[in-house]
């Protein structure tokens, strides 16, 4: 019995010693107390936080929202800040988005920077105009088989001061949604049934943040309108994860609450007299609509403007009446659609094929100076790459190719 007591006692002593060693090491290795982050050399913008957090989160907790389309995953490369002091060495995960020259100048991804000590950083002044709003879902209707027009109502009297081509970030709490509960318009059920998508579920255990471009333009006030394409699992393996945010948005119904922040953006129109050519596909319609309505309705531009949109079939075309109306109102605007897979019931007599080929054959091939035009594009990565290759072959410089790379 005495040996048992002795063994238990020795074991307890060993455990206590190990705990003491760990606590001592933690006190030496992990910073204790508050950390101060000085922003733009302005004492009024200094924030105080606890060590051990990411810089992106520390700023957000202080009401300073840095753009992060991937929600802090390190994949979008948007949450750039300049770290003047503190922050440690740049990480390999950052070097995919930051050049060596930028790194030497202190450029970092705030989602990858651990706050361990007092820091000095620089942020663009426009960051301080970014806010959060608790909004109410106004409508959430299909405009194509896998795309919803998602409209949220801002609080009474509130506006998001965005520019055409800008985007907001939307937050999703932990959730478990079932695709069978989605409100999908009857005309689109065919593909959903055929691929078995109504059997899919999406379970997310952490908060998610994603970015979406506005489809409304600044004079459509009091709302934020998005075009959201759901990221389903591949039909041949429905066990793979579905898109976290898009699944959540598809589950929302009028009256539901949702939090957004913004405005963000850099996909803005240049203030020149050059001809403007817009090319879009899929949910890349959103910034196209925003830009085109802004140019024709608010700015009332006299520049020559055209819009080229690629869709799979007639069922995937949307905002047709909107653009027909703009074309009727403005002699300097025209728009074109090409269907890559028109269905027999479409009775389609318009252009067919991929939009970059149609753009070339119908317009750019005989254009006097395509290199003098400004090209604005947003669509699936394959479309973007094809258009960019076409423009490069035509001698268009990088400075005249503007890309909203939501799928990159």
Curated annotation (Swiss-Prot):
Cofactor note: Binds 1 [2Fe-2S] cluster.
Enzyme class, broadest EC rank: translocase
Cofactor(s) it depends on: [2Fe-2S] cluster; FAD
Keyword Metal-binding in annotation: yes
Catalytic activities: a ubiquinone + n Na(+)(in) + NADH + H(+) = a ubiquinol + n Na(+)(out) + NAD(+)
Domain FAD-binding FR-type: 130-270
Residues holding [2Fe-2S] cluster: 70, 76, 79, 111
Domain of life: Bacteria
Residue ranges occupied by any 2Fe-2S ferredoxin-type domain in the UniProt entry: 33-127
Pfam families registered for this protein in UniProt: FAD_binding_6, Fer2, NAD_binding_1
An annotated GO cellular component: plasma membrane
GO process terms (BP): sodium ion transport
Lipid bilayer topology: Single-pass membrane protein
Compartments (UniProt record): Cell inner membrane
EC nos: 7.2.1.1
Keyword Glycosyltransferase: no
Subunit structure: Composed of six subunits; NqrA, NqrB, NqrC, NqrD, NqrE and NqrF.
Function: NQR complex catalyzes the reduction of ubiquinone-1 to ubiquinol by two successive reactions, coupled with the transport of Na(+) ions from the cytoplasm to the periplasm. The first step is catalyzed by NqrF, which accepts electrons from NADH and reduces ubiquinone-1 to ubisemiquinone by a one-electron transfer pathway.
Protein name, as recorded: Na(+)-translocating NADH-quinone reductase subunit F
């Amino acid at each position: 019995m005495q040996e048992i007591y002795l063994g238990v006692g020795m074991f307890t002593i060993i455990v206590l010693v190990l705990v003491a060693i760990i606590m001592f090491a933690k006190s030496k290795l992990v910073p204790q107390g508050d950390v101060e982050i000085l922003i733009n050399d302005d004492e009024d913008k200094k924030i105080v936080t606890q060590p051990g957090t990411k810089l992106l989160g520390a700023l957000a907790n202080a009401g300073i929202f840095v753009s992060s389309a991937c929600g802090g995953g390190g994949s979008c490369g948007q949450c750039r800040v300049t770290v003047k002091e503190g922050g440690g060495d740049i990480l390999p995960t950052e070097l995919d988005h930051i050049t060596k020259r930028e790194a030497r100048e202190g450029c970092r991804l705030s989602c990858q920077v651990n706050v361990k000590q007092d820091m000095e950083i620089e942020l663009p002044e426009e960051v301080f105009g970014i806010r959060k709003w608790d909004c109410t879902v106004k409508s959430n209707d299909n405009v194509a088989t896998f795309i919803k027009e998602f409209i949220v109502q801002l609080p009474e009297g509130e506006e998001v001061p965005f520019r055409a081509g800008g985007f907001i970030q939307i937050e999703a709490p932990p959730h478990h949604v079932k695709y069978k509960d989605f409100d999908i318009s009857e005309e689109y059920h065919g593909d959903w049934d055929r691929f078995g998508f109504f059997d899919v579920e999406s379970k997310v255990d952490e908060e998610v943040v994603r970015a979406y471009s506005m489809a409304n333009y600044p004079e459509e006030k009091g709302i934020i309108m998005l075009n959201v394409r759901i990221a389903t699992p591949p039909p041949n393996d429905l066990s793979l994860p579905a898109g976290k945010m898009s699944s959540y948005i598809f589950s929302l119904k009028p009256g539901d609450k949702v939090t957004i922040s913004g405005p963000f953006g850099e996909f803005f129109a240049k203030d020149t007299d050059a001809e403007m050519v817009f090319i879009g596909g899929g949910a890349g319609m959103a910034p196209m609509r925003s830009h085109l309505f802004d140019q024709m309705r608010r700015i009332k531009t006299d520049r020559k403007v055209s819009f080229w949109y690629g869709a799979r079939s007639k069922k995937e075309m949307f905002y047709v009446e909107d653009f027909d109306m703009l074309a009727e109102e403005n002699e300097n605007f025209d728009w074109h659609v090409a269907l890559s897979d028109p269905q027999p019931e479409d009775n389609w007599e318009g252009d067919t094929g991929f939009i970059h080929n149609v753009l070339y054959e119908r317009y750019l091939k005989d254009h006097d100076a395509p290199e003098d035009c400004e090209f604005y594009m947003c669509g699936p990565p394959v479309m973007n790459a094809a258009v960019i290759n076409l423009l490069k072959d035509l001698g268009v410089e990088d400075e005249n190719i503007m890309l909203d790379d939501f799928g990159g």
